[in-house]
C-alpha cells in the first residue's frame, strides 16, 4: 500500500513538473520571442535599439517582478484569500504607477541636461509601451505567486491550454501585421494581458 502511494506521488510530481515546464516554455516564448522576431523582421540595428530601451525602461520592472514573485509566494503559501490578493493588487498598481513616473522622469532629466542623448522624444511610443509592459509584468508576478503556491495539475493544465491557444491565435496577427517595433510591443502587451486574465480567472476558483 505504501509503495502504491509513493508511486502515485512520484507520478503526480512528474506530471506537475511537466506542466510547470510547459508554463515556463510559454512565458519564455512571450518574454523573449520578440527579440528574435524583431531581428528577423527589422534587422540587427532595430533589435539593437530595442535591447537598449528594454535595458533602460523594462529591466528595472523585471527586478521588482522577480523580488515580488519570490516574496509573495512564501506569504501566499501560509495565508491566502481573494480579498488579500485584491488589496495587494491595488497597492502594487499604485506603486508601479509611481515607479513608472519616477523612472520616466529620471531618464527624461538625463536627456534634458545633456548627460546622454537617449532619443526619448523620437522613440516616445516605444518607451511608453515598454513602461506599460513593465507594469503588466509586475501585476503578473503577483498572480503567478498565487498559482505557484496553490496550483494543482488540473489548474496548470487549463492555464497552459488557454495560454497556448492565445499564442496560436495571435501569432498570425503578429506575423502579418507587425509593421513596426511599436506594434510588436503592443502585441506582446496583449499576450501578457491575456495571460494575466487567464491566471486571475483560475485564481478565483481556488
Kindly give the residue locations of the regions a language model identified.
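Membrane-interface helix-loop junctions in multi-pass transport and translocation proteins
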Residues: 1, 46, 106, 113, ...
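Helix-loop junctions and terminal segments of transmembrane helices
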Residues: 53, 57-81, 148-149
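C-terminal transmembrane helix end/exit motif
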Residues: 1-8, 66-72, 142-146, 173-178, ...
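Membrane-water interface segments that mark the loop-to-transmembrane alpha-helix transition
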Residues: 78-107, 154-160, 203
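Membrane-interface junctions at transmembrane-helix termini in multi-pass inner-membrane proteins
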Residues: 134-161, 203
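Residue-level signature of transmembrane alpha-helical cores of multipass secondary-active transporters
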Residues: 13-28, 32, 36, 54-63, ...
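Interfacial/gating helices of multi-pass transporter permease domains
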Residues: 12-16, 20, 38-58, 121-124, ...
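Interhelical loop/hinge segments that connect adjacent transmembrane helices in multipass membrane
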Residues: 1-29, 74-84, 203-206
